[in-house]
From Swiss-Prot:
PANTHER family: DEVELOPMENTALLY REGULATED GTP-BINDING PROTEIN-RELATED, MITOCHONDRIAL RIBOSOME-ASSOCIATED GTPASE 2. GO terms for cellular component: cytoplasm. Belongs to the TRAFAC class OBG-HflX-like GTPase superfamily. OBG GTPase family. It comes from Streptococcus suis (strain 98HAH33). This is GTPase Obg. It holds the Pfam family DUF1967.
Length: 437
């Protein structure tokens, strides 16, 4: 059996915008032709697209880095560089994307064909044709392309199913799934047979249909990661109805009621909302000796934990192997699904707000100043660093423009207020220059 991978850590990087060009029009009979350098092309975005044909995150085990192409540089004759194509990354249905640095959820991808731009490409730098003014009709100024967005991500896959089969290993979940659907799970008489969630479609005699997932076997301590643990619990989050399968034959020497309590405790510990999902108790292996006695004992113990005003869960005695009692179970499941709404997986506070990439945030400081151990001044801040990376330092006019932008942002004044003196070293990233007062 191929390994099932339901979490992955990857890095995505959008394409850098193409650099703008400095060029001048030089044609016969056109004296003083003026600037003619075009803009760079837009960098490619990284786009996640949901593909219903994918079932695991296995591909991300071998390919963890995804980089979109950069935009083309601007050209002469005022021609713009070509924008790069987006990089399409296909993911399975049910993939949750988190920011690995903040832990916040970015998006939940559940519909086939759904698209989400996970990293935005940088805009192209402007060519010198953009900087012409009456005072400076032939500027030697251009911009570098803007860097593409770069992100560290955690992908998490939760299978999409209406109904989840839960229960201890070897209670007969895989057998039940194979009987009620066309799924062909691998079945064996040993624990942890099911490592991969198996999905199957059920169609009842009345024409109702729904998806069922036989999820990896659960043991006590799963919510703390014991055994297959949180892998199992992650997948049950998307189900609307839970079929709690119990081995009423007690063939492995366990008490069915104790199994029932233990599994519910794990569900509650992992996520309190899991217990809001309606459960149907499936009393399996009723064709085995003493199963009837165990079922009666189970019902008595169950009743003691409910008061007279509470409704007991439905119990359906079945035998997966002997194909007994299945029709009633499936009809009841379809009826319960009909009146059970979908559950919100996450609270709104779990999601990270995705700001417009070029949006203005008035609360965000334009720059920050700190002092290094060697007494140099360090300038930082998203806006300032973006201006820096887009400045073409090969052109004197571009450097002078950058200096004017710093003054306009109040950097010179702020440095003086912090005590900077003529000749002090100021750093932005790896670039350093002298402060001139």
């Amino acid at each position: 059996m191929s390994m099932f991978l339901d979490t992955a850590k990857i890095k995505v990087k959008a394409g850098k915008g193409g650099d703008g060009m400095v060029a001048f029009r030089r044609e016969k009979y056109v004296p003083n032709g003026g600037p003619w350098g075009g803009d760079g092309g837009h960098g490619g975005n990284v786009v996640f697209v949901v593909d219903e044909g994918l079932r695991t995150l296995m591909d991300f085990r071998y390919n963890r880095r995804f980089k979109a192409d950069d935009g083309e540089k601007g050209m002469t004759k005022g021609m713009h560089g070509r924008g790069a194509e987006d990089l399409i990354v296909r993911v399975p249905q049910g993939t949750t994307v988190r920011d690995a640095d903040t832990g916040k959820i970015i998006t939940d991808l559940v519909e086939n064909g759904q698209e989400f731009v996970i990293a935005h490409g940088g805009r192209g730098g402007r060519g010198n044709i953009r900087f012409a003014t009456p005072k400076n009709p032939a500027p030697e100024i251009s911009e570098n392309g803007e860097p593409g967005e770069e992100r560290n991500l955690e992908l998490e896959l939760k299978v999409l199913a209406d109904v989840g089969l839960v229960g201890f290993p070897s209670v007969g979940k895989s057998t039940l799934l194979s009987v009620i659907t066309a799924a062909k799970p691998k079945i064996g008489a040993y624990h942890f047979t099911t490592i991969v969630p198996n999905l199957g479609m059920v169609r009842t005699k009345s024409g109702e249909s729904f998806a069922v997932a036989d999820l990896p076997g659960l043991i006590e301590g799963a919510s703390q990661g014991v055994g297959l643990g949180t892998q199992f619990l992650r997948h049950i989050e998307r189900t609307r109805v839970i079929l709690h399968v119990l081995d009423m034959s007690a063939s492995e020497g366990r008490d069915p009621y104790e199994d029932y309590v233990a599994i519910n405790n794990e569900l509650e510990t992992y996520n309190l909302r899991l217990m809001e999902r309606p459960q149907i108790i499936v009393a399996n292996k009723m064709d085995m000796p003493e199963a009837e006695e165990h079922l009666e004992e189970f019902k008595k113990k169950l009743a003691t934990n409910y008061d007279e005003f509470e409704e007991l869960p439905q119990i359906f005695p079945i035998s997966g192997i002997a194909h007994q009692g299945l029709e009633n179970l499936l009809e009841a499941t379809a009826e319960l699904l009909e009146k059970t709404p979908e559950f919100l997986l996450y609270d709104e506070s779990d999601f990270q707000e995705e700001e417009a990439y070029y949006g203005f945030n008035p609360d965000e400081p334009e720059f920050a100043i700190s002092r290094a151990d060697d007494a140099s001044w360090i300038l930082s801040g998203d806006k300032l660093e973006k201006l820096f990376t887009m400045t073409n330092f090969d052109r004197d006019e571009s450097v002078m423009k950058f200096a004017r932008q710093l003054r306009g942002m109040g950097v010179d004044e702020a440095l003086r207020a912090r005590g900077a003196k003529d000749g002090d070293i100021v750093r932005i990233g790896k670039f350093e220059f002298e402060f001139v007062d």
